[in-house]
Amino acid sequence: MSKILVFGHQNPDSDAIGSSYAFAYLAREAYGLDTEAVALGEPNEETAFVLDYFGVAAPRVITSAKAEGAEQVILTDHNEFQQSVADIAEVEVYGVVDHHRVANFETANPLYMRLEPVGSASSIVYRMFKEHSVAVSKEIAGLMLSGLISDTLLLKSPTTHPTDKAIAPELAELAGVNLEEYGLAMLKAGTNLASKSAEELIDIDAKTFELNGNNVRVAQVNTVDIAEVLERQAEIEAAIEKAIADNGYSDFVLMITDIINSNSEILAIGSNMDKVEAAFNFVLENNHAFLAGAVSRKKQVVPQLTESFNA
């Protein structure tokens, strides 16, 4: 039997990397599976900070599961096929551990699925470690903690579940870090956007959603200064227009999120701007508008877009 590959979504963030790494280890220890954690892209700057801090080598990057000789895969932090490995339909999905909506997903065989409406996939994996009484090393605790911090913006996001607030201190203790100090340093490491090209910036954390027959790309960048990002609006818009033309997106929505004040500016271009405006009850001026209190793509952007596009 070939090795089972475990990976998060394309354009991996700290939760995609952390949850896949941790679950691959858990699957070996608790279930006796022959697993390897891989990634569908290079770590972003935030995740690179995490890996360096805990002395963990970045997982190798793959573009095809079958090319690796894999017949089975386990997905963490995603389930939608368009967010997964390119040949996902050609291999067996052995299992899924996720905290997102379920869409564009079907399998030929029964599978293991663990889906919970919590702040991160890493939160789920950590509880599975406890359920199976598997010891958590400092490194794995650090990766899971980082995934939780990243996805909940240090427990400030509305996606944060009460259980996330309970396990974060546990993981911080296991990882040997101060939760607040480490969390802020980690998040700030991911806000260095000046060195990024516009093309890189709009692809740091981007996912495609199928909304009523439309392929809508929703990207998010974290910053401590929204105005600084908007100074690059012309080049960002040019990059978005090219991405739309090259990939057949109907619309592109970019969340520029202020991690300090917990607000976002929405920059949007595409064929359905009336639906985008209706989703958030605002008017785009020069292609952008302020969205107070919005920090979560999963809870404060995608559901609203879905409802509007389906109206």
Curated annotation (Swiss-Prot):
A GO CC term assigned to this protein in UniProt: cytoplasm
Residues that span the membrane, as ranges: none
Binding site for Mn(2+) 2: D15, D77, H99, D151
Catalytic activities: diphosphate + H2O = 2 phosphate + H(+)
Subcellular location: Cytoplasm
Record keywords: Cytoplasm, Hydrolase, Manganese, Metal-binding
Cofactor(s) listed: Mn(2+)
Residues reported in the UniProt entry to bind Mn(2+) 1: H9, D13, D77
Gene3D superfamilies assigned: DHHA2 domain, inorganic pyrophosphatase (n-terminal core)
Molecular-function GO term, any one: manganese ion binding
EC id: 3.6.1.1
Record SMART domains: DHHA2 (SM01131)
Cofactor info, note text: Binds 2 manganese ions per subunit.
Pfam families assigned to the protein according to its UniProt record, in alphabetical order: DHH (PF01368), DHHA2 (PF02833)
Metal-binding in keyword set: yes
Domain of life: Bacteria
Family recorded in the similarity comment: Belongs to the PPase class C family.
Complex and partners: Homodimer.
Record-linked NCBIfam families: PRK05427.1
Protein name: Probable manganese-dependent inorganic pyrophosphatase
Species of provenance: Streptococcus gordonii (strain Challis / ATCC 35105 / BCRC 15272 / CH1 / DL1 / V288)
Gene that produces this protein: ppaC
